[in-house]
C-alpha cells in the first residue's frame, strides 16, 4: 500500500498509551482483525475496549516504526454483551472496575449501556452500587458522550478536539447550540479563544450570527490586545480607529458598541483628569482594590515604634558596616511607619539596608515573610538575606481552577500568617498579582517593598512601582549614594551612567565590563557563541550552562534569541546518538539543552531536596536531563527541582541559551553576554539597556555597535503605558 494513501480501519482499543487532555493528541493500540496497530493523532477521550472506525494513512516513525496517522475518529458503541463487558472492564465508564463490570453485564446483558444512560436506578440492584454511586456512574457516562456529540456537531465547523472540550467545560451540554448561535461566545472568560479563531468558526456556520455579537467581541478583543501590551486602561477615543479597522465598520458604530458594553458591565468607564478611560472589569477591580488597600494601610498603619539610633549603631557594629544617611532613613521609616518603598540602583546598598530592617523586625519578635515574583528572584533573595523566600504564587498558596486560572488560598478571608512581609523586585509585579498579594495581607501587617524604578515595567499589565512612587502618598526612600566598593565595578559605574543618559565607558581593560566591537550582526552572533562556549569558560572557569547567560534585546534577527539559540545549541549541545531529541514546532529539544518555561503551569509536579511541590513558572530556567522517546516524557532540572513532563508540555518551553531582556528580569547571572546591534527602534531605549546590564554580577560583555549602545543610553523614551493606580491612590471617594 502506498504511503499516505487514505484508508479506513476499524477495531477495538486494546490500550490508550498516551493522551493529552489539552490538545487531544492520543497514542493507542488498536486490535484490528489479527493485527495490533499503533494509531496516533488528535482524538476525543477514549477508553480501552471501545470500538473505533478510523480514517487516515500509514506512516513510519524513526523511533516507533509503522503507525496509523488518524485524521478522523468515529466512535462505535459496543453492542454485544462480550464487547460491553470488555469495554466496562477496561475502565470505559468511571466508577466501574472489572469485577463490577462482570456483575452488571451478567444481570443486564446487551441492555447494559442503555440502563446506565437512561435507567441508572436499576444499577443499585447490584451489590456494591449505592443509589448515589449509580447516579454518578450515569452522570459520568453521559458527560463522556455529551463531549463526543458536541465534537461530532462542531468539528465540521473547523473546531479541534481540544476546542470542543473547552467549549463543553464552559457551556455544558448546550455548547453546540450556543456556538451555532454566537460563536463569539468562545472569546469569553473561561474559554479564551482568539477573536480571529471565532471569526473563522463563524465563517463556517451555515447561518451567519447576529452582527452585534461580532462587534462586541471585536471591541473586547482590542481591549485585550492593549492589556497584553501592558495597559490597564485605554482612552476611549483611541479605541475608535483600531476597532473600526478590525471590524470593517465606522467609528460611530464602534462608539455605540462601547456604550452597549459599558451598559452590560463588560467594560468599565472612568474619567481621569477629564478624559474618559475604558477598563476590562477584572483589571478595573484589581487596580482600584489595590489603591483602596494601600490607602487603608495608610489610614490604619501598623503599630510602629521609635527606632533608636543605638539600635542601628548596634547592627552596624555587629555586621562591620557603616550605613549612609539614606539607608538610616529607610530603616527608621520601616520601623516607625511599617510601610516603605525602598528603591535605588546597583551598588546603593538596598540589600544591606534590607538586612538591617529584617534584623530589627526579628529583634521585635515579628514573624517575617519574604517573597519575590519569580523562582530565581526568590532564590537570590534567600541567598542575600540568609532567610527563606518564596515566590508570590507559592506564598499565596496558589491553586488552579477549571478554566486554568490561578486561585489563591491566601486571601482576605484566609490572610497570610505574617506580621511583616518584604516583597522584592516590585518592578516585575503586574497589577493582578499585586492586587491578590495585598488582599492576603493581614490587618496591621508591615509591608516593605523593594525595587528599581529604572528597570523595565512588568511583562503583565500595569506599572505598579512607578505609579505608587509617582502618587507621592506612600513613603519612599530612594538610595542614590553609590558606595566606594561598588564603584570599583565598571558594571555598576556604567549602569549609573546609562540611567543618567551618559554613554557607558567602553574599552576599559582589566575591569568587569567589556566591549567587543563589530558592525556585522552575523559576526556578532558568532562572537557571542564563541564567548559562551570557549572564551569565558577558559578565562574564568565559568560553566556555559550554569554561569553564563546570553541576553538579547529582541527575539528576531541575527542577534535575536531565536537565531542565537540555534547557533549555541549547535555549538554547546550538537546532535549525538547518545542524546535523544524531539521536535516541537520549529524547535528541537535535545537531552542536555538549556530551557526556559514560558508560562505559569501550576500543575507540574516536582521533587526537590527540601520536599515535593507543584508549579513551574514563567521565566524558570532548567536543563533538559532526559528525553524518553518511548514514554514520550521529558525530565528537566529547574535548579534543584526535578520535573517530569509529557512531550506535549514541551510547547510551554523554549531554548534558553539566549533569553530576552524582558525574560531575564528578576535574575542575576555571574556572567552576561549581550549583543547590541540591529536592535529594533521600538526596543532601543535606555531602560532596556539598563535592565540587561544590571543582570550581570561579575562579568558583562557587550558585543556589537558602539553607536547603537550610545544612542540607547541617550534614548529616555519609554513605551507608554496607560494605567490608573496613581489616579485611584489620589482620588478621594
Outline where the language-model segments fall.
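Accessory, non-ATPase domains that flank or precede helicase/AAA+ motor cores in DNA-metabolism machines
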Residues: 1-310, 733
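Loop/turn positions that initiate beta-strands
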Residues: 49-51, 592, 619
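ASCE P-loop NTPase helicase motor core
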Residues: 233, 328-331, 336-509
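Conserved pre-motif I regulatory segment
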Residues: 311-338
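Conserved helicase motor core of P-loop NTPases
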Residues: 453-614
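C-terminal accessory regions
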Residues: 500, 609, 618-733
